[in-house]
Structure formats: structure tokens, C-alpha cells
From Swiss-Prot:
Single GO molecular function: ATP binding
EC number: 6.1.1.5
Catalytic activity from the UniProt record: tRNA(Ile) + L-isoleucine + ATP = L-isoleucyl-tRNA(Ile) + AMP + diphosphate
The protein's name: Isoleucine--tRNA ligase
Motif ('HIGH' region): 68-78
Binding site for Zn(2+): C936, C939, C956, C959
Quaternary structure (record): Monomer.
UniProt-listed NCBIfam families: ileS
Binding site for ATP: K626
Cofactor binding note of this UniProt entry: Binds 1 zinc ion per subunit.
Length: 965
């Protein structure tokens, strides 16, 4: 069915020139690759960026940057982290806080050292000493920092880029020595022989935070029989009493302790076996009259594994087994059963634990209790040493296990061998297995201040709240912190050792002196200068007696000292910091190392609040990896890839919008489909801003500003809605719920503005006389909306916000959107009763639009103006709201007909004939009819009274009056 005016003769004349059409230089396309750098240059030239925060008069806000490692290209994890921080800093700046964001870099450690070595030829490596290695590492780190810094700047991140903190700077190294010194003088630093996580691939000790635990590691597990040589009388007596047929000699000549281990290479280091005093154990006998000892709860499992029929002889508690002796499996000596702890369970194995104090923490602790030797059978390369006997020279990660298994098999001590899948610690850098190895190391004694650290955790706000439980459990259960490393690229432990002796020289005088030297000359002097030049004057006479230590500090001690090297040192910052914000893996990393050092030195946490985020995954929730080909590069998101169709240049703001769109408290996906969706949202916001800017091109706020009660009801509602949205977005920023900002922004731009207010405003803006009140009042509202919209989005869409601000067509007091400050509104703009009426009318409008859309889908009509609407109300509240609008509304703006963009609307008591469509719903009966009258060629409304226009055109009286016809 065709529309009623389809047969009418149309004129070629157009009234377009008489309309107030959109005019703005704010382009529909962002052209981000060119425009964003221009905006960044504008900020830099006008000191808008981080200096703006310094000039604020409010309280200081310190978000302390967790330093990324100065190695490698930037990835989506960097983007998530740095943009989150920047959103917060920009918001706080707009709120008037003194904000000074100091970006940092973690510069020491093995990855950089390995990169330097990889870049050298073999002959260069041979001639390389520690000092020259450090020089090359410094140069490498600076290059990496410069590359990463340029990337961060391109993302729109504000910070003190001219003065970042680097852990390789003299001032930082000096402050770190100060932290170490205070911990030592407080009694929290000691040197001792103790098993530590050791990486044969890196040839250094590792802290817990430097480990990762893949779930799919396979170990060669073995069940071994250890021949019993001596049994306490009370155990023998019990056995013989309960088994009269077995003589005492049988227990000593043909009985065995059964152990299980996943590290066969540690068998030569065995010094004891341990039992749990609370567990019940059984002596059993097999068909060959051999007697075995293992946990009672494992009887069925072991019988099945060994494929043997065992008979239980008698049962004893673990506490009764102490001092049973056995023949060492590889050495000519006897060892004994000792009492262990709750780490011995019956979940797997035999309930009896092979104990090598030099190669396990629990083993070491039991060894200390029983004064067992701490035998270390492995060198720094992972090769078995002379203490392993005939196995010397084999490698624990290669052939040692096989050699020892074959040996045990030959001695008829091997009961069973099988592969065992479990979580196992790997070196996070080399991705190779680690081992436990007893070496002389420096430790921070966490026991000395654990209770203070736990109290400090309680004093901090953790977001999400689960972070508190996570770090609390880690600190409760952690052992002492091994802080020494056997590498050159790091901050040295400032200790001197007596030549040919065990005495060390480390005291307050030494520490203060080294700290002063490092402050002036840097840590390189430790390798460059002789001992006499490093010692204080009082020790010069005995300088020949001492030699420098060669260990450096754990890089987690480096970054964990940043509160002292940065927050305490810089007057623009606060200690404790207001906020630490990093990935959730930092509960075992930077959050924890910073907490431990700060509590040990100052008995307080280094932060007031800790916020964590998840990891960036691909669209399918998989970890990104080159092998999977699913790596998303933030640089390609911004600048585009080689194929601009498949990898378009979205710009930094779309990257930032992604950060604001996700629930970052968990792992977050990113990929091409998500980017397309975000680009659509970005475009909608931009087009909304463009429409607002384009329709205020001739508006002057100095001439046409209005009080709220002078405005039509629709405009009053719009300003009230602006206040609501601003409040909601403020709350989202304050609570760090940026995905709420994303949702509110979308709804405001699409639902409130594009689909409602701006849709209705078209007639007011385009058709009205330029200076007519109905147009100027709308422009007044739009100016308020666009100014405040620019501010509200600026923490996230900083480039778009500035672009909007630069295209506001009238003079503003502020050169930049960031100088505007956070929106403050008149209380008079809030009107709850008005809100309820408008909500009722919007609900009715939605239902009427559905009915009109039904006509359009059937091709009965084209535009909504070709219709008129009859409404038979059922809903009392909607009817009341229509009466309210009729009574209090402005007749030029607040006619519900104009809100519907139809040619006529009326409330009726019965429905007319000749309906195009009738829709019945809970609000009432909605009848859509063809509009009566003729179409005005200028405004397209249908009117009964039409006058002749130019060149056979038709005009309504309103339009004729506007163009003076």
C-alpha cells in the first residue's frame, strides 16, 4: 500500500538553504593515526598533561607505578595496566587532586643479562667481565625503556616521562641499600646454608615469585625398599607377641622400609626417612617372606601397585617408629627413621618420606631438629658432585635419574617405577625445571615480622576483596625470603668476607658508607673499585683482610624497595601511596615484596589500597602465544597492520575504550570482533558529539543562556538527566568500576540523546527561525551536554574529549578540556517528579514507535510524519503524565505530537475507523492512521492548512512565516 502523497506532483525546488543545517569541523571520522598525535603535541606544548595535576590545589593523590620489566615489546597486559592507571590519574586530576604520576622500570635481572650475552659473539663472551657486562646491560635497558616509553605516550598515558624512576639509577640503588641496611640492623637479614629454589638453567637461586607451576610436568617416581638394620626393642616385642611364628631375627634380616620419591637424583643425599607420628603404619609380609613397612591407609593401593598379596603382621603409630635404622641405599652407612610433621600424608606414596636436608625445605627443617648433615649433591649447573659418589658428573635434569634407578634395580631395591604428573616449579624466565639445592644464601627472616605484615594486610583496602585473603594466606605460609642471586646484573649485597675465613663485615657504618658511595657513583663501583676504596676510613688499615661479596639482590627486592626510592624521596608523592594497581599475579610478587620491606623497615604497609586486574586473553579465552597465532598487538590496534582491511587503525582511544569496557577484576578477552564492536560504540559517541557540536555553530552562551525554570519541560528533563549521568559516571570512576562508565556512556548517547532528545530536537534545530526560543533553548541545553560530555569521557576517551573541546564553536575559559575540572551542577537542575512523568511518556513513546515501525515494515508508510496517532489509555500514570505535559508544557516544544515526530497525536475515548494498525498493550490501545492534510515541503509535517510556496511547493503556515512568505 502506497503512502497518500505518492501521486502528488513534486517540485524540483528545495528549501534546504532555509534550514539551519549542521556545521562543524569535528569530522565524522576520527582519523586517529594523525589526529591523536596532534592532540598529544597540543598537551605537551601547553603543559596540559602531567603538569596540570601538579598545579592543582587539592590533596595529593599518589598512584605508585609497579615497574614493568625493561625488556621486550609492549603487549595487551601493558595496555590494560597502564590505561587503567591513566584513567584514574586523569579523573583525579579533573577532581582537583595534586597528581604526579612517576612511571618506573625494573631494570636488573637475568632476562636482560641473557639478552646481552645472546647478542655477543663467543670470543666476546670469553673476554667479558662483570663490569663490562653491566655497562652493556645498562645500555640495553635504556634502549628498551625508550621504546616502551614511546608506546606508553602514544596510548595517551600522562606521566613524568622526563624523570621516570629506574631501578638502575644511582639514587634508586642507594635507597635500596638503605632498605637492606635497615632490615639487617633490625635483625631481619641473615646468611645461612639452606635449600632454595635453584635454577640450573640460570645458575642462580630464585624466589617464589620467580617461579611458575605448569600442571603437566612428569617426574620419574620410584618406590624403593630400604633394608632395616636395627629396630627398637619395644617394636620388636610387639611384632613377636602378635606373630609368634616370626622370630626376632626375621625383622632384622629380611625387613624393609618402603619409600616413594619423585626426585630419584636426591637418593644419594638421603640422611633419614620421616614418618608422621599420628599416622598408623603396618608391617606386612609377602609370599617371599619379605617384610615391608608403610602406612596402613595405603595398604590396598600399594598391594595393587606392587601386584602382591600382603598380610598385615602388626600395626604401630608413627611415633613408635623413631630410631629404626636402615642401610643407606647408595652409601656404606646407616640412617634412621625420624619424626616429621603434617606434610607427611597418605594421599600418595607410602606415608614414609625420603629425607634429604640439602634438597627440600621440610627435609631441612626435620634435619635441623635432628642435627642431620645438610648434604648438597648438586653443583650450580645441576650436575651431581663428589658427594653423590659414583653418579658424579651426571645431570639431575638429564641422566641422573636414569642412572640411579638402574643402580637401585641392580641392588634389588627398586620396587616400582612410574611416571607421575604433577605441578612442578619452573624458572619463569628460562621455562625450565628448578630444583631444591642447599647453598649459602642471604635471607630475609619473614618470621621476624610476619605478625606485623599480617596486621598491615588488615589495614589495607583490597579490591577485589578476595585479594586480601590471597595475600594473607601467602604471607602466613611463606618461608624466609631468599634475597641473594648469583648474577652480576643487579644491586650488590654490600658485604665483605674475611679471606680464608667465615667472618663477615657488615654493620651500620659499612651500610651508610656504601649507600653514600652508590648515591654519588652508582653500584658499578662495587665491581670497579678495590676493597680499600669501598671501605670506610676506619677500616682502611685492614682492607687486605677482606674481599667483596659477589651476590646481587633479588629483583623483587629491587622493585619492592620502590616505596623508599620513589615515594619517600619525591616531595610530590606520598608514602604510603594511595593506590597500587597491578595484575593479580603481583600478590606473590610486587605487592608482597613491597609489603615485606616496608613493614620490616617502618612497620606499616606501603599502600592504602591495592587494586588488581586479570590477564588479557584472546576472544576464545585462551592465553595469547605466538605458537597459537592469537597474539593481539596494541600497536596494530592503534596504527593498523599491513592489511588495513583486516587490521584497521582504530587509534588509542578505542584501545582505551576496551579497557573501560571489561570487568578487569577477572581475565579479559580481546580480538578483532571485540574491536569492531568497540569501534561501533566509539563511532556512536563521536557522532553524538558531532551532532551536538554541529547544531550549536551559531550559538553564543553570552546572549542565549537560560535559567532552568525558563526552559521547556523536555529541556529541563535533559539537564536533569545530564546531572544523573554525571553522578553515575562519577561513582563509576570513584569505585573503579569503569565498565559501568562504559555502559552508562552508551546508554546516554544512544538511548537518551540519539534516540530521544536529539531525535525530537531535529525539528527545533533545523526548521525553526535561527533565533527562535525553541531553537536557542535547545542549543543552550546542547552546549551544556557537549561541554560536560567531553569532560565525563575525558579520563577514558582523552583524545576524543580534547577534539570535542577544540571544536566547541564559542570561546571557553579553558584552553583544554582537562582544565575545566569535574562537572558541578546547580541543584535546581534535579527534578525527581519531572523524571517520573518523562519516564512514563518515554515508555508510551516506545510502544507507539513499535506500532509505527510495524507500518513501515509493511511498507504502508515511509516516515513517521506520514502518520497520526490516537491513544486510548489504560494506564492511569501515563494518562496523568499526558495531562501534566498538556498543562505545564511549552506549546512550541512540549507537544507530545512533536516528541513522537508524527503529524498529530490525540488522547481519545474510542478508536476511529480506517486504521493502518492497532496495537493493544498494558498502556492502552494505540491506533496508527494516515496523516490528514498535505505535506509541507520544508518541514515534512502534514497539515490541513497549506499555502503555496516557491515553484509550486507547499508550505505549512509555520514555515511560510519563518521564511517570510
Amino acid at each position: 500500500m502506497k503512502s497518500q502523497n505518492s501521486k502528488e506532483q513534486k517540485s524540483e525546488f528545495s528549501y534546504k538553504e532555509t534550514l539551519n543545517l549542521l556545521k562543524t569541523d569535528f569530522s565524522m571520522r576520527a582519523n586517529s593515526v594523525l589526529r591523536e598525535p596532534e592532540i598529544q603535541d597540543f598537551w605537551a606544548k601547553n603543559n596540559i598533561d602531567f603538569e596540570l595535576g601538579l598545579n592543582n590545589s587539592g590533596k595529593t593523590f599518589t598512584l605508585h607505578d609497579g615497574p614493568p620489566y625493561a625488556n621486550g615489546s609492549l603487549h595487551m597486559g601493558h595496555a590494560l595496566n597502564k590505561v587503567l592507571k591513566d584513567i584514574i590519574n586523569k579523573y583525579k586530576t579533573l577532581k582537583g587532586f595534586k597528581v604526579h604520576y612517576v612511571p618506573g622500570w625494573d631494570c636488573h635481572g637475568l632476562p636482560i643479562e641473557l639478552k646481552v650475552l645472546q647478542n655477543l659473539k663467543s670470543h666476546e663472551r670469553k673476554n667479558l667481565n662483570s663490569l663490562s657486562l653491566r655497562k652493556k646491560a645498562t645500555d640495553y635497558a635504556h634502549k628498551q625503556i625508550n621504546n616502551q616509553m614511546e608506546g606508553f605516550k602514544r596510548w595517551g598515558i600522562w606521566g613524568d616521562w622526563d624523570n621516570p624512576y629506574l631501578t638502575l639509577k644511582k639514587s634508586y640503588e642507594s635507597a635500596q641499600i638503605g632498605v637492606f641496611g635497615k632490615m639487617f640492623l633490625n635483625g631481619y637479614i641473615y646468611r645461612g646454608l639452606k635449600p632454595v629454589h635453584w635454577s640450573p638453567s640460570s645458575r642462580t637461586a630464585l624466589a617464589e615469585a620467580e617461579l611458575e607451576y605448569p600442571d603437566d610436568h612428569y617426574s620419574k617416581s620410584i618406590y624403593v625398599s630400604l633394608k632395616i638394620t636395627k629396630v627398637p626393642d619395644k617394636v620388636l616385642l610387639k611384632g613377636c607377641q602378635e606373630n609368634p611364628n616370626i622370630k626376632k631375627e626375621s625383622f632384622l634380616g629380611n625387613s624393609f622400609i618402603t619409600i616413594w620419591t619423585t626426585t630419584p637424583w636426591t637418593i644419594p643425599a638421603n640422611e633419614a626417612v620421616a614418618v608422621n607420628p599420628k599416622i598408623s603404619y603396618v608391617f606386612v609380609i609377602d609370599e617371599d617372606k619379605r617384610i615391608f613397612l608403610f602406612a596402613k591407609n595405603l595398604f590396598s593401593e600399594i598391594s595393587e601397585k606392587f601386584n602382591k598379596i600382603f598380610k598385615i603382621l602388626f600395626e604401630v603409630k608413627g611415633s613408635s617408629l623413631e630410631n629404626i635404622e636402615y642401610q643407606h641405599p647408595t652409601k656404606n652407612k646407616n640412617c634412621r627413621i625420624v619424626i616429621g610433621g603434617d606434610y607427611i600424608t597418605t594421599e600418595s606414596g607410602t606415608g614414609i618420606v625420603h629425607t634429604a636436608p640439602g634438597h627440600g625445605i621440610d627435609d631441612f627443617n626435620v634435619g635441623q631438629k635432628y642435627d642431620l648433615p645438610i648434604t648438597c649433591v648438586v653443583d650450580e649447573k645441576g650436575n651431581l658432585n663428589e658427594y653423590s659418589g659414583q653418579f658424579k658428573g651426571s645431570n639431575v635434569l638429564k641422566d641422573s635419574n636414569d642412572l640411579i634407578i638402574e643402580y637401585l634395580k641392580g641392588k634389588n631395591l627398586l620396587l616400582l617405577q612410574e611416571n607421575y604428573k604433577h605441578r612442578y616449579p619452573y624458572d619463569w624466565r628460562t621455562k625450565k625445571p628448578t630444583i631444591f639445592r642447599a647453598t649459602e644464601q642471604w635471607f630475609a627472616s619473614v618470621d621476624g615480622f610476619r605478625s606485623s605484615a599480617l596486621k598491615a594486610i588488615e589495614d589495607v583496602e583490597w579490591m577485589p576483596a578476595t585479594g586480601k585473603k590471597r595475600i594473607y594466606s601467602m604471607v602466613v605460609g611463606r618461608g624466609d625470603w631468599c634475597i641473594s642471586r648469583q648474577r652480576s646484573w643487579g644491586v650488590p649485597i654490600p658485604v665483605f668476607y674475611k679471606k680464608n675465613g667465615n667472618e663477615i663485615l657488615l654493620n651500620s657504618e659499612i651500610i651508610n658508607h656504601i649507600q653514600e658511595l652508590f648515591s654519588e657513583y652508582g653500584a658499578d663501583i662495587w665491581w670497579d673499585w678495590e676493597v680499600k676504596n669501598l671501605l670506610p676510613e676506619n677500616y682502611l688499615k685492614e682492607s687486605d683482610l677482606w674481599e667483596k661479596g659477589t651476590d646481587t639482590m633479588d629483583v623483587w627486592f629491587d622493585s619492592g624497595s620502590s616505596w623508599a626510592a620513589v615515594c619517600e624521596q619525591r616531595s610530590e608523592l606520598k608514602y604510603p601511596a594511595d593506590l597500587y594497581l597491578e595484575g593479580s599475579d603481583q600478590h606473590r610478587g610486587w605487592f608482597q615484596s613491597s609489603l615485606l620491606t616496608s613493614v620490616a623497615v617502618n612497620n606499616k604497609p606501603p599502600y592504602k589500597r591495592v587494586l588488581t586486574h586479570g590477564f588479557a586473553l584472546d576472544e576464545n579465552g585462551r592465553k595469547m602465544s605466538k605458537s597459537l597465532g592469537n597474539v593481539v598487538d596494541p600497536n596494530i590496534i592503534i596504527n593498523g597492520g599491513n592489511n588495513k582491511k583486516s587490521e584497521p587503525a582504530y587509534g588509542a582511544d578505542v584501545l582505551r575504550l576496551w579497557v573501560s569496557s571489561v570487568d578487569y577484576s577477572v581475565d579479559v578477552p580481546i580480538g578483532s570482533n571485540i574491536l569492531k564492536q568497540l569501534s561501533d560504540v566509539y563511532r556512536k559517541v563521536r557522532n553524538t558529539a558531532r551532532y551536538l557540536l554541529g547544531n550549536i555553530h551559531d550559538y553564543d552562551p553570552n546572549i542565549d543562556s537560560f535559567e532552568i525554570d525558563q526552559l521547556p519541560l523536555l529541556d529541563q528533563w535533559m539537564l536533569g538527566r545530564l546531572v544523573e549521568v554525571s553522578s553515575q559516571i562519577s561513582h563509576a570512576y570513584e569505585s573503579y568500576e569503569f565498565s559501568r562508565f562504559f555502559q552508562i556512556l552508551q546508554s546516554f548517547c544512544v538511548v537518551d540523546l540519539s534516540n530521544f532528545y536529539l531525535d525530537i530536537a531535529k525539528d527545533r534545530l533545523y526548521v525553526s527561525a535561527k533565533s527562535q526560543f525553541r531553537r536557542r533553548s535547545c542549543q543552550f541545553v546542547m552546549s551544556k551536554v557537549v561541554e560536560n560530555l567531553a569532560v565525563l569521557i575525558s579520563p577514558v576517551l582523552c583524545h576524543m574529549a580534547e577534539d570535542i573541546w577544540q571544536n566547541i564553536p564559542y570561546l571557553t575559559k579553558e584552553k583544554s578540556v582537562f582544565q575545566r575540572g569535574w562537572p558541578i551542577f546547580s541543584q535546581s537542575w534535579k527534578n525527581e517528579s519531572l523524571n517520573q512523568h518523562i519516564t512514563n511518556l518515554r515508555n508510551l513513546r516506545v510502544e507507539i514507535n513499535k506500532a509505527i515501525e510495524g507500518c513501515r515494515n509493511k511498507q504502508i508508510i515511509g516516515a513517521a510524519l506520514e502518520t497520526e496517532v490516537n491513544y486510548l489509555p489504560k494506564d492511569k500514570f501515563v494518562k496523568d503524565s499526558l495531562n501534566w505535559l498538556r498543562k505545564f508544557g511549552n506549546e512550541d516544544v512540549d507537544l507530545f505530537r512533536d516528541w513522537l515526530i508524527v503529524s498529530n497525536f490525540q488522547v481519545v475515548s474510542y478508536l476511529a475507523e480506517n486504521s493502518l494498525i492497532i496495537d493493544s498493550n498494558e498502556l492502552g490501545e494505540i491506533q496508527i492512521l494516515k496523516a490528514r492534510g498535505l505535506k509541507c515541503d520544508r518541514c515534512w509535517h502534514y497539515q490541513k492548512e497549506i499555502v503555496s510556496g516557491i515553484q509550486n511547493t507547499k508550505l505549512c503556515k509555520r514555515c511560510a512565516k519563518i521564511i517570510n512568505l
